[in-house]
Amino acid sequence: MLMFVGLGNPGAKYARNRHNIGFMAVDEISRRHGFSPWRRRFQGETSEGTLDSERVILLKPTTYMNESGRAVQEAAGFFKLGVGDVTVFQDELELPPGKLRVKVGGGIAGHNGLRSISAHLGNDYRRVRLGIGHPGVKELVHGHVLSDFAKSEMPWVEALCQAVADNAGLLTGKRDSTFANKVHLALQAKGFLDKGDAGAA
């Protein structure tokens, strides 16, 4: 069994925020693969199903971003999952819109959701970093991540979440590079990434 965690803030006020692209990604995985209806538990919401014959639980912490680790720790403890069984889908300022990277371990790059998870679970979980772009200067970061995607951005956001969901089964077999390549190729085909943007790096 594996756990895929989408990061975000709960409630309609935050639903379309850039900071909530992790929620959007796991919502799409649940929808496209016929997972169970979301239900409240573990200080979050869960949906369960199967990807490539592997049982997967999706978790959206409802603790607010800064306390995400509490929900992840509670769910991981209940299912007896190790840190290596956890994959976190997060927004990433340092990647251009629509690009992603997959990495096990590493720093938190100022991301409060990752900081909380690392404090509660350790650092060696897998991160799927979903690019939202940087506003250009540090002072604008807070407002950038907590503002909604513009209407003009939604086509690439939806395409990214769909490609992540379509290829999520590759993550159950730790085929991270293949997953990243297939997602990037899907966005290229729709004109959201240039050909030079493909690849897992």
From Swiss-Prot:
Gene Ontology annotations for the cellular component aspect, listed alphabetically: cytoplasm
Site residues by UniProt (Discriminates between blocked and unblocked aminoacyl-tRNA): N9
Keyword Phosphoprotein annotated: no
Gene3D superfamilies linked: Peptidyl-tRNA hydrolase (3.40.50.1470)
Keyword NADP tagged: no
Recorded GO MF terms: peptidyl-tRNA hydrolase activity; tRNA binding
EC number: 3.1.1.29
One Pfam family named in its UniProt record: Pept_tRNA_hydro
Site positions for Stabilizes the basic form of H active site to accept a proton: D91
Localization per record: Cytoplasm
EC class of the enzyme, as a word: hydrolase
GO biological-process terms attached to the record: protein quality control for misfolded or incompletely synthesized proteins; rescue of stalled ribosome
Active-site residue numbers: H19
UniProt family annotation: Belongs to the PTH family.
Subunit (UniProt): Monomer.
PANTHER family linked: PEPTIDYL-TRNA HYDROLASE
Protein name: Peptidyl-tRNA hydrolase
Native species: Bradyrhizobium sp. (strain BTAi1 / ATCC BAA-1182)
Gene: pth
